[in-house]
Amino acid sequence: MQHELQPDSLVDLKFIMADTGFGKTFIYDRIKSGDLPKAKVIHGRARWLYRDHCEFKNKLLSRANG
């Protein structure tokens, strides 16, 4: 059985990179520009809300579709 992600699920940088196909530099540049919120640091680990990742991905797709 595979776990289904909820809007408040936490995802890491590896997940975001795998899901978008972009590398660390691209992702961190998007954080600097404000397109992706900064990660929440929880017990020394950087995590994003799945909801924030989805919004970020939708922004990328809408820009690509013009």
From Swiss-Prot:
What highest taxon heads this organism's lineage?
Answer: Bacteria
Molecular function (GO) terms for this protein are: DNA binding; identical protein binding; sequence-specific DNA binding
UniProt keyword annotations, A-Z: DNA recombination, DNA-binding, Repressor, Transcription, Transcription regulation
Q: What is the effect of changing R45 to K/Q?
A: Retains approximately 10% excisionase activity
One annotated GO biological process: DNA recombination
Q: Its quaternary structure?
A: Interacts with TorR. Binds to the effector domain of TorR. This interaction, which does not interfere with TorR DNA binding activity, probably prevents the recruitment of RNA polymerase to the torCAD promoter. Binds to DNA.
Q: What does this protein do?
A: Transcription inhibitory protein for the torCAD operon. Also acts as an excisionase and plays an essential role in the defective prophage CPS53 excision.
Q: What does the similarity note say?
A: Belongs to the phage AlpA excisionase family.
Q: What is this protein called?
A: Response regulator inhibitor for tor operon
Q: Which organism is it from?
A: Escherichia coli (strain K12)
Which lineage ranks, top first, belong to the organism behind this chain?
Bacteria, Pseudomonadati, Pseudomonadota, Gammaproteobacteria, Enterobacterales
